[in-house]
Structures are given as structure tokens and as C-alpha cells.
């Protein structure tokens, strides 16, 4: 059984030769080169992923939704009762939440995973629970480093097992009342931004309570002193079990050489952690949508990513990742199904007849 260090060491580099071949193929399709814009770049990115065997393709699709509660809820940083985490997790098993509807439309299976819900176990939910909620980051660490490492390893293995069973496209999501607070803390740490720049309203927090949320994030960072150069340290000190879980999906997908669609602000914070832990992960991440949460722009700038969709969404759950899955499939369809210029005897300006 491989250790976490060994798994991370084995993340493959993109296949640049396959990417070059893909670009050459795309340039010869029935269109002016570059005219399908970022769809072309996405197809080339996919071609470079070793788990896809050198060609853009989508097999089975899976949405992994990490569910957990947060001790920082006690600081008044969320309007929803904590029990809503458990209620919504149960609703996910019935297919009635936003991510479930959008994932069904995209043909993706939703895996609802309990990594720290503060309630009795829920039928139909995958049990990877570390504890009933993490610690209150405003007074101490969210969890121990050991807890974070064990959960990362478990999620990586779960993700790789799905890959072995035919999943070639992953999406990440989360569920947890008050979880935008630790996400903002992580973004603040990784980007060097003040809490005021990255703290937003989350699930409709009244403007009158934003200053308290900013103060909570600042206190969490001051008390825990997370090391911005150590992704696991940041996750364990000011993160949460759901954020660790999403990071694990990204690491696991990359280990298998497969793409993973990010969701919104919560996933950006996890992506920052994943890229700090293993920079090679970056090549396997696909940004789905531009979250309406305040700190989104700063997080995305630090990741050097431009999402494909601008929908003013901030639901979370993985809803944006599910919505973007057809875009990935469209890039594959373009690559495989379009005709070629040469077959139609079309010579574009600046090219030579062969």
C-alpha cells in the first residue's frame, strides 16, 4: 500500500508530444485555426493527460461531494443552522439538490461523501468521517496534521479506485455550513491577501455580519500561524474536512493522469492547497465557472486560471463543475467528429497546397 508521499511523487507530467499532435490535428479541422478558441485549448490539455491515452475523451463521469461541519460555525459566520449540512446530504442521496439535478443532466454519478458531518451516519452516504465536525479555527486548528494526511490518502485511493472502474472525468463539490470562512482563510494565506479582500457573503450572510466574519478569519490565521508553503499545514490549521477531501480528489485524479473540474470558491481554496502540495496537479485542473463569491478573482489569479462559465453562481455543491461537464465533452466531440480541411480540398490563406 503506497504512502501519501509515494502517491504524490508518482503524479505524471503531461505528455507534450501528444499535445503537439493534438494541436496539429485541430489546426487541420474544417475551420480557421484557433476559431473555436478555448475549446481547442481544452482539447489539447486533455490530450496531454496520460490517463486519457493521448486523445481527448470522456468515459464515465463522477461528481465527488465532500460533506462536513465546521467548529467555526459557533462564531456567527453563517445564517443557516448547522443541521442543514446533514439535511442537504440526505437530500443529495435522493437526487433533489442543485448538483444532483445538474449532474444527472450531464450524465454524471454523484458520490455523497461524509468526511465530518456533525450528525448520526446518513444512509446512502459514503462514510469517510474523521470526526463530527472539525475544530473551531478561531480558537485553534481545524484538525491535526495526521488527520489531514489520513483523509487525503483515503480520498486519493477512493478517486483512483473510481478511475480503475472507468471514470475519466471528475468534478469536485462540497457541503458544509460556514465553510466559506475556512476557505477564505486558506485563500488569504496562500495569496497573501488580507481577509477583507477575500471574505464574502457565503450563503447570504447579512452585510452587517461581514465585519465579524473578516475578524474571525484574521483571528484564525493569527492564532494558528499556517505556513503558506506547506499545503497540508494550511489545510489542517485553518481548513476543514470537506476542503481536505476536495484537495484529495484533485491529487487522486492527477495521480491517475485524469482531469478534474473545479467548482467555485471553496474548490479554488482546495486547488491552491493541492498545487502547493504537488505542483504537477495544476495541469489536470479545469476551472468550470467564475464564482460570485468575493475572493474568487484573487484566488483564480493566483491559480492563473480563467473559468469557462460566468453565471453569477455561488451555490457550491459542485453545481458549476457539473454544469461544465458538457463543455469538456464538446471539446472531445470537436476533436473526433469534425471533418478535415484536406479532405475538402480547402487551403486557407498562408498555407501551401499538398
Curated annotation (Swiss-Prot):
It is an enzyme of class 2 (transferase). It catalyses: 5,6-dimethylbenzimidazole + nicotinate beta-D-ribonucleotide = alpha-ribazole 5'-phosphate + nicotinate + H(+). InterPro entries: Nict_dMeBzImd_PRibTrfase, Nict_dMeBzImd_PRibTrfase_bact, Nict_dMeBzImd_PRibTrfase_N, Nict_dMeBzImd_PRibTrfase_sf. GO terms for molecular function: nicotinate-nucleotide-dimethylbenzimidazole phosphoribosyltransferase activity. Keywords: Cobalamin biosynthesis, Glycosyltransferase, Transferase. Its EC number is 2.4.2.21. One of its GO terms (biological process) is cobalamin biosynthetic process. The keyword Transcription does not apply. Pathway: Nucleoside biosynthesis; alpha-ribazole biosynthesis; alpha-ribazole from 5,6-dimethylbenzimidazole: step 1/2. The active site is at 317 (proton acceptor). NCBIfam families: cobT_DBIPRT, PRK00105.1. Catalyzes the synthesis of alpha-ribazole-5'-phosphate from nicotinate mononucleotide (NAMN) and 5,6-dimethylbenzimidazole (DMB). Belongs to the CobT family. This is Nicotinate-nucleotide--dimethylbenzimidazole phosphoribosyltransferase. It comes from Salmonella arizonae (strain ATCC BAA-731 / CDC346-86 / RSK2980). The lineage of its organism: Bacteria, Pseudomonadati, Pseudomonadota, Gammaproteobacteria, Enterobacterales. The gene is cobT.
Amino acid at each position: 500500500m503506497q504512502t501519501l508521499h509515494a502517491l504524490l511523487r508518482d503524479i505524471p507530467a503531461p505528455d507534450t508530444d501528444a499535445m503537439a499532435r493534438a494541436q496539429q490535428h485541430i489546426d487541420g479541422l474544417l475551420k480557421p485555426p484557433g476559431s473555436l478558441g478555448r475549446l481547442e485549448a481544452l482539447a489539447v490539455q486533455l490530450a496531454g493527460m496520460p490517463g486519457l491515452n493521448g486523445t481527448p475523451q470522456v468515459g464515465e463521469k463522477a461528481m465527488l461531494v465532500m460533506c462536513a461541519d465546521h467548529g467555526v460555525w459557533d462564531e456567527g459566520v453563517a445564517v443557516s443552522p448547522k443541521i442543514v449540512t446533514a439535511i442537504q446530504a440526505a437530500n443529495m442521496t435522493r437526487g433533489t439538490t442543485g448538483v444532483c439535478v445538474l449532474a444527472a443532466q450531464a450524465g454524471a454519478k454523484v458520490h455523497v461523501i461524509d468526511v465530518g458531518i456533525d450528525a448520526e451516519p446518513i444512509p446512502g452516504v459514503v462514510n469517510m468521517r474523521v470526526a463530527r465536525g472539525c475544530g473551531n479555527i478561531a480558537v485553534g486548528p481545524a484538525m491535526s496534521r495526521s488527520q489531514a494526511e489520513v483523509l487525503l490518502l483515503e480520498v486519493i485511493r477512493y478517486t483512483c479506485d473510481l478511475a480503475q472502474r472507468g471514470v475519466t472525468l471528475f468534478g469536485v463539490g462540497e457541503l458544509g455550513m460556514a465553510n466559506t470562512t475556512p476557505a477564505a482563510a486558506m485563500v488569504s494565506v496562500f495569496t497573501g491577501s488580507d481577509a477583507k479582500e477575500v471574505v464574502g457573503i457565503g450563503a447570504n450572510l447579512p452585510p452587517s455580519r461581514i465585519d465579524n466574519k473578516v475578524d474571525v478569519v484574521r483571528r484564525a490565521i493569527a492564532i494558528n500561524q499556517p505556513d503558506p508553503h506547506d499545503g497540508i499545514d494550511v489545510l489542517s490549521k485553518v481548513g476543514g474536512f470537506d476542503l481536505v477531501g476536495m484537495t484529495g480528489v484533485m491529487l487522486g485524479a492527477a495521480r491517475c493522469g485524469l482531469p478534474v473540474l473545479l467548482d467555485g470558491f471553496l474548490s479554488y481554496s482546495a486547488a491552491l492547497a493541492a498545487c502547493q502540495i504537488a505542483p504537477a496537479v495544476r495541469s489536470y485542473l479545469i476551472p468550470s465557472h467564475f464564482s460570485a463569491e468575493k475572493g474568487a478573482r484573487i484566488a483564480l489569479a493566483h491559480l492563473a486560471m480563467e473559468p469557462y462559465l460566468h453565471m453569477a453562481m455561488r451555490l457550491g455543491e459542485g453545481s458549476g463543475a457539473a454544469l461544465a461537464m458538457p463543455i469538456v465533452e464538446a471539446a472531445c466531440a470537436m476533436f473526433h467528429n469534425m471533418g478535415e480541411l484536406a479532405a475538402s480540398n480547402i487551403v486557407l490563406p498562408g498555407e501551401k497546397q499538398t
